[in-house]
Amino acid sequence: MKKIAKIVLVSFSLLIFIIAVLIFRPVPIVSENKAISESGIVKEIYSNKGNDVIFVMENNERRFYINRGLENGLELNNLKEKLIGNAIVVKYPNYWTPLDWNNSVRHISKVEFNDEILFNELKK
């Protein structure tokens, strides 16, 4: 019986470790040719307590965010004035995390508007 309990405990510990690794691994920084590209008309832009800049696009269930965008020099009011109602292209890495199991929130690696790059953290 002790052997079974030990196996269960080791298995459970390993499972918890794997889940923790999946949750806490950083978002990968990819090159542009490996990024997924999506375009749409910006419906809403807002920020959260973590200083992320969040984009909501028309006819798209996903939200897109720039991690700590306000800390990296982006101005929320300027983005709203420039982008709401206009088409943008966002590029993001293909990754999965248990915290967002259905991929409803995507980390933006690049934002383009009218051939202007507003944000870019893709590998060169």
Give the ranges of each region predicted by the language model.
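Hydrophobic membrane-insertion alpha-helices, especially the h-region
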Residues: 6-23
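Short boundary/loop segments of OB/S1/cold-shock single-stranded nucleic-acid-binding domains
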Residues: 19-36
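A short, sequence-level motif marking secondary-structure junctions
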Residues: 66-73, 123-124
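Short nucleic-acid-contacting surface segments enriched for D/E, G, S/T with interspersed K/R
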Residues: 73-91
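OB-fold/S1-family single-stranded nucleic acid-binding modules
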Residues: 94-123
